[in-house]
Amino acid sequence: MQVRTRAAGTGEWTDWQDVETHYTQHGADPDSSEAATGKARGATAPLWVGESDGVEVRVLPQAGDPEDVDPVDTGSDEGASGGEGAGEGGEVSTLPAGMRLDLVDPGEAVPGESAEGAEEPRTGVMTAAAQAASAANSALVPLGATHIPSLTAEETRKELVTLRGTELTEQQQAKPYIGPRPSIVTRRGWGADESLREKSFVYTSKVKAAFVHHTASGNNYSCSQAPSLIRGFYRYHTKSLGWRDIGYNFLVDKCGRIYEGRAGGVAKPVKGAHTMGFNSKTTGIAVIGSYGSKKPSSKAVKAVARLTAWKLGLHGMNPKKKTSLTSAGGNLYAKGTKVKMKVISGHRDGFNTSCPGGKLYKKLSSVRSKAAEYQGR
């Protein structure tokens, strides 16, 4: 499947761009309440195109030459509803029924939005849903905060006792291995419309592993546009795909800025929809961009290491070790299969996919080493 767009103002068309298919592999576990709503549907990965006033899509039902296939005429914003095309040898192949093109407007920039993320203070009345999302971080920052500031190693260790004192093991109490808390832009900071998500928060018992992803949305964005991309992902996940909230627990842009993803509190074990089969007892971190052939920035890689050092440290997990997870069902491990997984893994380790892209996947070894170093191991 390929897409090209026409830039607003210049009228110039982009080259044809491939979009990642089978995007629901990032979704909820098969038997979860989120998957059972009946709202979820198959989709491609979202593609960031910036300000555009025209779009064309072409779809190959099976392997063939894209130059021999006419673009699918979407007809309207709702897109086409499928059809037939000629495959190899002149055979007719049917396109999926109900195909449509969703155009996602990320909305206007939030006040103070810049390359450094949204800055305080934020004005305006908070809705009940916005208050609930913000209150989930009340142990870390005041209600309505747009960012959670970083802490020193000592401050983080003291906070760990405050957050999880009675749950800490004797070893954690004696010598807690946890990385300094990094700065995180909150949902209010990137301008989340809290009316789009389900009202309640869903938690898992603890966080034993982190799965690293890429959004496969392209790399043609500036860091000042990152909040817009995240608002787009959020709307796409909830309105187009029928998920309860954005799927990822955290997102990281190319400048190394970390953003809160799914609502429920950054220090809490929020259950995401990022690695089908392994959303329980894990957290999902998505680096914004496509990293199959392009290397991720050093700032982004460092941010993933800092984030995992802190988040995994809250639960006493060693980034350089392995842990046991039980599959809830997927295309790589059958439901109920116990799997030894690296504490910091790529999406492809839990599901048969190219995510997080070969170039980012190769960086995970250094992420593990740096995260362990940040934890003081």
Q: What do the PLM-derived regions correspond to, one by one?
A:
Residues R244-I246:
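Carboxylate/His-rich catalytic cores and anion/metal-binding grooves
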Residues T5-D73:
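Beta-sandwich interaction modules
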Residues G79-T215, N219, K254-P269, A273, ...:
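Basic/polar, cationic surfaces and motifs that engage anionic cell-wall
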Residues A8-G9, D253-C255:
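Short acidic-glycine loop/turn motifs at beta-strand connectors
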